[in-house]
Curated annotation (Swiss-Prot):
Residues 195-426 form the Radical SAM core domain. Its cofactor is [4Fe-4S] cluster. It comes from Danio rerio (Zebrafish). SMART domains: Elp3 (SM00729). InterPro entries: Elp3/MiaA/NifB-like_rSAM, Methylthiotransferase, Methylthiotransferase_CS, Methylthiotransferase_N, Methylthiotransferase_N_sf, MiaB-like_arc_euk, rSAM, rSAM_horseshoe. This is Threonylcarbamoyladenosine tRNA methylthiotransferase. It comes from the Eukaryota.
Length: 547
């Protein structure tokens, strides 16, 4: 294993997980039923009896997701299972019977949005089910008291929880999936899902991590590392391409740590997946922390040069000060990070390195912060995620002596100003690039594409471009994007042999012809359900009068 550049003494990473049994295990099948929390009322009211008589599976559900691509993937799986069960997934929150709120606990503002959404749902008398990292990490918080929760390891049972919530019961499934005492990666990868973008498949390759960062709340929710077996991931990629996907995102809390719990590693997985990527499709690797990628730099440089893999890597630094990194328990030093970046830049020409910086961590001095500014000036990262430090409840960093709010805010502004002072793409004016077109821009004026280095290129909004590889000439450069003029003589290239699924269509549960989100319950079953529902309501009213 490649030695870390710094001399900081840290525990051997491989000592942090048990790998005595490396045999991949099958995920547990979902339970058929769930026991709702018992009511304490001695006598039910007529309204409660009518609620209990409601037949679930016909209502409209609005799903809102905050946070990372792992959370987005969980949301897609939950939407797919609910649609297969007969629920209609709606984009109109006001029209929904139930709100499924999939939360993020990384930063305080994200949790604030989550809390506000709960309050708004209650004001509108909506049924509510909570998901994601916030309720998993802190299920006893007052503002989620008595609300139903689906844990991050239990998303394959979302239908059970929503069914009970629709009937007025409070249900909480927060356990971990284990078999023979070994933690599993999570829900099965072959579950039905509704992709937010039918052209992009987001695959979680592992859940949890090996770190114990002092500021991180996600660890409380996602837990320790648990990787999916290579063969399951390969099969999921195959299925995705069979459904018209042209771009694969691999995600997790730390992709670089993949496989350490099952006797494998990230390069082994990537070489297997590369074999499955058809011409005209691309693979994007998600975030990796520095310690776990250092020993694989040579292999990773070859993988990132592959024509069907984006030459892009997201490696969070957080601070260029070794003393701050030590207080964060990041298990690397700044020299490790610079070695990684320099190595990849030399061997993967043009590679995009994205990174994260936390401004105002407890104990950060002016000198510490200046070291971070100097490193950003040196590398001029085209993609830089700047975060003002917010102490998260229950983390060691929340107990440390905090910096004044105005200091944290000022440092955040200073780093942001530095980031916006340079333009990373101006030298690419006039270049000819091959780009993969996957989505519509926020203003609906362009299609959004990405070149080999995962740099954003806007192209004219022509239907024939979507899902295709297009040859363009760059004619305009902005801070965060380029604009490309398609070369008419260059042929369009596509990865798929079958058309992509329609927006709202369920992956792994397709039907012939056009399939709207509400079509997964046969008409006869819907009619029977309506009859049973009306009968139950009439019976409840009759019993109320008799009592």
């Amino acid at each position: 294993m490649m030695a870390l550049v710094c001399d900081t003494a840290v525990d051997d990473i491989e000592d942090m997980v048990r790998i005595t049994d490396v045999t991949p295990l099958q995920r547990q099948a979902a339970r058929k039923s769930v026991v709702p929390r018992a009511r304490k009322h001695k006598q039910e009211t007529g309204e409660q009896m009518q609620t209990d008589s409601v037949i679930p599976g016909m209502q409209k559900v609005w799903l809102k997701t905050w946070g990372c691509s792992h959370n987005s993937s969980d949301g897609e799986y939950m939407a797919g299972q609910l649609a297969v069960a007969g629920y209609q997934i709606t984009e109109d929150s006001s029209d929904a019977d139930l709100w499924l709120l999939n939360s993020c606990t990384v930063k305080s503002p994200a949790e604030d949005h989550f809390r506000n959404a709960i309050r708004k749902a209650q004001e509108q008398n909506k049924k509510v089910v909570l998901a994601g990292c916030v309720p998993q990490a802190q299920p006893r918080m007052d503002y989620i008291k008595d609300l139903s929760i689906i844990g991050v390891q239990q998303i394959d049972r979302v239908v059970e929880v929503v069914d009970e919530a629709i009937k007025g019961h409070s249900v909480r499934l927060l356990g971990q999936k284990k078999e023979k005492g070994k933690r599993l990666g999570g829900a099965r990868l072959d579950l039905p899902k509704i992709r937010k973008n039918p052209l992009i498949e987001i695959i979680s390759i592992n859940t949890g991590c090996l770190n114990a960062c002092t500021y991180c709340k996600t660890k409380h929710a996602r837990g320790d590392l648990a990787s999916y077996p290579v063969e399951e991931l390969v099969e999921r990629v195959r299925q995705s391409f069979q459904e018209g996907v042209c771009e694969i995102w691999l995600t997790s809390e730390d992709t670089g740590a993949y496989g350490r719990d099952i006797g494998s590693d990230l390069p082994t997985l990537l070489w297997r997946l590369v074999e499955e990527i058809p011409e005209g499709a691309m693979l994007r690797l998600g975030m990796t922390n520095p310690p776990y990628i250092l020993e694989h730099l040579e292999e990773m440089s070859r993988i990132l040069q592959h024509p069907r893999v984006f030459s892009f890597l997201h490696v969070p630094l957080q601070s260029a000060s070794d003393s701050v990194l030590m207080e964060m328990r990041r298990e690397y030093c700044c020299a490790d990070f610079t070695h990684l970046v320099d190595y990849l830049k030399e061997r993967v020409p043009g590679i995009t390195i994205a990174t994260d910086i936390i401004c105002g961590f407890p104990g950060e001095t002016d000198e510490d912060f200046e070291q971070t500014l100097a490193l950003v000036r040196r590398y001029r990262f085209p993609s830089l995620f700047i975060n003002q430090f917010y102490p998260r409840p229950g983390t060691p960093a929340a107990l440390m002596q905090q910096l004044p709010a105005h200091v944290k805010k000022q440092r955040t502004k200073e780093l942001s100003a530095l980031f916006h002072s340079y333009r990373p793409y101006d030298h690419k004016m006039g270049e000819q690039q091959q780009v993969l077109v996957t989505e519509e821009s926020f203003d609906s004026q362009y299609y959004v594409a990405h070149n080999k280095f995962y740099e954003q290129v806007l192209v004219p909004k022509r239907p024939e471009y979507l899902g295709k590889m297009v040859q363009v000439e760059v004619y305009e450069c902005g801070k965060h994007y380029m604009k490309g003029r398609p070369l008419e003589e260059a042929p369009l290239r596509t990865a798929y042999t079958t058309a992509p699924l329609l927006k709202g269509q369920v992956s792994g549960h397709t039907q012939a012809g056009v399939c709207e989100p509400q079509c997964w319950m046969p008409d006869g079953m819907r009619i029977l359900a309506v009859v049973l529902l009306l009968s139950a309501v009439l019976l409840a009213l009759l019993m109320e009068k008799l009592l």
